[in-house]
């Protein structure tokens, strides 16, 4: 829609410029009428609604409103043209307005309108957002001495009357708690309570119940961008230790907090629905690495899903220039989902050595799925929200459809958790999709 709006207004600007040059007139009256018509058309599009009214259109709407007001005032006053016609001025004005319109439609171009994916479960889904304070940990990204605070969001079956398994999700390196919302909704509609965490200072931004917004720590962002296991194993190991300590601490605390709330009276409905004996964890990228770590840390976790994530928590050190991994068999059922971004590199990227080993026969209960034609960020809802950014971050265009990819992931994740958290059937998904 953003491209369509820009094209319509851009073509109109060029047409006015050409017409003005042909008639050797500024055509100010006609231009004023067109400004009013443009704003009126925009409002009609929003009401119908052809335009999904949201923040992506705010700046453009303000500009069109201002131009319409100026045009209306000029028409009412019947203001005559005072500036003499000059073709150069007409051309520069058209170029300037086109550039301005393009700039203001960029949010709609980068984040185009899209329909939310339909849920297939029997339950309608409700959601709440909460802020948790971990009184046992001090925030390490600031020097205020404050305890670490985490903003979380829970999705759960609405109007349900029994208890359901708990699934906790950890976002990727620069992600947010909404990174895989289509997956959370699907799981909740099928009878799960899903909690996604904003890892404060490790997420792009997060907003607490008090309205305070906290943005990503620039030092952390630089570290993630600089990390290169092929070039410096020791430095990467130090990064992994630091990141995983924070991430696993967050997940561990959130699980404990939810389990504690589930045992209380007079708490939010979401907590009352939690079956404290059935817990799964999952995550994307860095978040998946933390989820894999939690699978070893907690005895009450029954299944782990990692969306393209190395076993960072299993790296015990560096010896002779190579990572040293735990030798113990991974203790819980695990589903690893890969895209083209890593699939052909699993045997080459040192941090993925344990992942590569799990592709062959092992004693661990491990499943491996390759989403062929997809990239790293196609495994998240960013692929729906911004195909352009997804293509840029992936480094190439995905050759598989976004909805097909996400629906397949949702289906496989549901089947995995149904099997290992609800005891429904045998999970067999494996291989390429």
For every predicted segment, state its role.
Residues 29-77:
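Membrane-embedded alpha-helical segments of integral membrane proteins
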Residues 39-41, 45, 108-163:
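N-terminal cap/lid segment of alpha/beta-hydrolase-fold proteins
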Residues 58-60, 86-90, 116, 356-433:
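C-terminal catalytic-base region of ester-bond hydrolases, centering on the histidine
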Residues 85-112:
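Internal/C-terminal transmembrane anchor helices
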Residues 162-172, 183-186, 194:
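Short beta-strand element of the alpha/beta-hydrolase
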Residues 208-276:
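Alpha/beta-hydrolase active-site loop
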Residues 254-322, 328-329:
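Primarily recognizes the serine-hydrolase "nucleophile elbow" in alpha/beta-hydrolase
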Residues 302-376:
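The feature captures the conserved acid-bearing segment of alpha/beta-hydrolase catalytic domains
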């Amino acid at each position: 829609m953003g491209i369509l709006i820009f094209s319509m207004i851009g073509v109109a600007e060029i047409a006015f410029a050409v017409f003005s040059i042909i008639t050797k007139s500024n055509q100010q009256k006609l231009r004023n009428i067109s400004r009013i018509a443009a704003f009126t058309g925009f409002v009609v599009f929003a009401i119908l609604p052809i335009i999904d009214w949201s923040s992506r259109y705010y700046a453009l709407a303000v500009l069109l409103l201002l131009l319409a007001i100026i045009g209306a005032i000029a028409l009412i006053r019947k203001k005559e043209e005072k500036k003499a016609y000059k073709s150069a001025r007409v051309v520069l004005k058209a170029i300037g307005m086109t550039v301005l319109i393009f700039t203001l439609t960029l949010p709609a171009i980068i984040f185009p309108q899209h329909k939310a994916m339909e849920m297939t479960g029997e339950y309608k889904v409700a959601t709440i957002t909460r802020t948790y304070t971990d009184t046992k940990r001090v925030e390490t990204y600031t020097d205020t001495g404050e305890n670490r605070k985490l903003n979380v969001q829970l999705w759960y079956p609405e109007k349900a009357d029994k208890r359901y398994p708990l699934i906790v999700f950890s976002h990727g390196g620069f992600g947010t708690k909404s990174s895989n919302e289509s997956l959370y909704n699907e799981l909740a509609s099928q009878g799960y309570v899903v909690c996604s965490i904003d890892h404060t200072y490790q997420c792009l931004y997060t907003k607490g119940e008090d309205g305070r917004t906290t943005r990503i720590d620039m030092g952390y962002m630089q570290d993630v961008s600089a990390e290169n296991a092929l070039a410096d194993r020791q430095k990467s190991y130090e990064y992994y230790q630091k990141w995983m300590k924070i991430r696993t601490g967050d997940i561990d605390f959130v699980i404990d907090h939810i389990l504690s709330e589930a045992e209380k009276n007079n708490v939010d409905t979401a907590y009352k629905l939690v079956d404290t004996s059935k817990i799964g964890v999952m995550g994307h990228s860095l978040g998946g690495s933390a989820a894999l770590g939690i699978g070893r840390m907690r005895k009450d976790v029954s299944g782990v899903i990692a969306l393209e994530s190395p076993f960072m928590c299993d790296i015990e050190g560096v010896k002779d220039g190579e990572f040293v991994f735990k030798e113990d068999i991974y203790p819980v059922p695990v589903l690893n989902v890969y895209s083209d971004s890593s699939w052909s590199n699993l045997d080459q990227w040192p941090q993925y050595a344990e992942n590569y080993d799990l592709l062959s026969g092992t004693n661990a209960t491990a499943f491996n799925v390759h989403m062929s034609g997809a990239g790293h960020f196609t495994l998240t809802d960013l692929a729906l929200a911004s195909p352009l950014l997804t293509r840029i971050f992936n480094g190439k265009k995905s050759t598989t459809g976004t909805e097909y990819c996400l629906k397949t992931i949702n289906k496989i994740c549901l089947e995995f958790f149904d099997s290992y958290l609800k005891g429904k059937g045998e999970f067999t998904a494996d291989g390429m999709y």
